Structure formats: C-alpha cells, structure tokens
A protein has these predicted regions:
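Short alpha-helical transmembrane segments in multi-pass integral membrane proteins
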Residues: 4-25, 79-145, 179, 190-192
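Active-site loops and adjacent core secondary-structure elements that bind or stabilize anionic groups
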Residues: 1
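Small-residue-rich hydrophobic transmembrane alpha-helices
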Residues: 51-110, 114, 147-166
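Interfacial/gating helices of multi-pass transporter permease domains
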Residues: 43-62, 128-132
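Residue-level signal for short hydrophobic patches within transmembrane helices
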Residues: 15-34, 60-67, 142, 168
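Membrane-interface helix-loop junctions in multi-pass transport and translocation proteins
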Residues: 164, 174-190
C-alpha cells in the first residue's frame, strides 16, 4: 500500500521562492498585454479608421519588440549565475555590456523600421489610413530605444531576483499610457 509522504519543508520553501520571484514577472507580462489592450480600447472608441491604422502600426512594432525582448532575455541567466556566486563586479559589467548591445540593436531596429516607414504606402493599406499611420509610427519609432533600454534593466533586475521593480515600472507605465492616451483621444485638437 502506497503511503503518501508529507511535503518536505525544502520543497515548500522552493515553491515560496518560486512564487515570490515569478508572480511579479507574470504580473509584468500581463501589464504588457494590458498596455496594448488599453490602446486598442481607447482608440476603438474614437474612430474605426484610427483603430485600423493603430492596429497595423502596433503589429509592425510588435515584431520588432518581441525580437528585442528575446534578445534581452539572454542577460537574465548570466546575471543570475554571477549574482548567485557573489560576483557583483562582473554583474555590473554584464549590465553595461547589455545596455551597449541593446542600444546597438535599437539602432539596427530603428533603421529597419525607418525603411518600413518610408515604404508604408507599399504595404497594401488603404490610402486614407496612411495619414493616420505615419505620425503614430514616428511616435513608436522614437520610443523603440527606450523599450530596449528598459528591457536591459528589466532583465538585469530579474537576474538579481528583484522582479518587483520592473513589475511596478510596467504597471506605472500602463497608468501613464492610459492618461497619455486619454488626452489626445478625448481632446482631438491635441492629436498629431
């Protein structure tokens, strides 16, 4: 007869550590999804053409941002390993290297996205959407460098097990984004 063993205290401690570390990461990832959802919801109440233009541009940038996020994920295990061994001076160098690499990637992605911007009229979208797409595209293009810098710092913070900082920054960014969207959507004379 199989007798169920009581859960070992070590396992319980591991589960607690895992949840303490992982829940802020999950909340932060949900925050990224909420960011896009809030944009879509607010623009959708304004006009169908603006929603179509924003959706197209957002999808173009999603490809670049997912690529950049995947690139930045490489830092977390390196920093985590060094931090776990107490090699804090090397951890700092890894952050500097990551910032440099992410800035280089931002320059490359900005160039690629700029080429797409110059050729947006060739991507088969209705002519009436192009004047709506262009200013929004430029705003997202300007923000690309900041997204990559944030990714570098977020992955560094995750690597040193400080996952709450990036979670709060993402949630705070959502609040600022909603406020920032509300003004031009509600007061159309302030839009680009």
């Amino acid at each position: 007869v199989y007798k169920r063993q009581p859960m070992n205290r070590t396992y319980i401690q591991h589960y607690k550590s895992l949840f303490t570390l992982g829940i802020p990461i999950v909340i932060g990832q949900v925050g990224v999804i909420i960011l896009g959802f809030a944009d879509t919801l607010m623009i959708g109440h304004h006009s169908t053409n603006e929603l179509a233009a924003a959706s197209f541009v957002n999808n173009m940038f999603t490809l670049a941002i997912i690529f950049a996020t995947g690139f930045s994920y490489g830092l977390t295990p390196i920093v985590g390993s060094l931090f776990g061994r107490g090699e804090t001076s090397v951890v700092g160098r890894m952050l500097k290297n990551s910032i440099f690499a992410n800035v280089l990637l931002a320059v490359l992605l900005t160039f690629i996205m700029w080429v797409l911007y110059l050729n947006i009229h060739r991507l088969g979208q209705p002519e009436e959407l192009l004047p709506l797409m262009r200013p929004y595209f430029i705003v997202l293009l300007i923000s690309l460098l900041f997204v990559l810098l944030f990714n570098a710092f977020k992955q560094f913070a995750d690597g040193i097990t400080d996952t709450r900082v990036s979670m709060w920054l993402l949630l705070g960014g959502n609040v600022m984004n909603i406020i920032g969207n509300y003004i031009p959507v509600s007061y159309t004379h302030l839009t680009l």
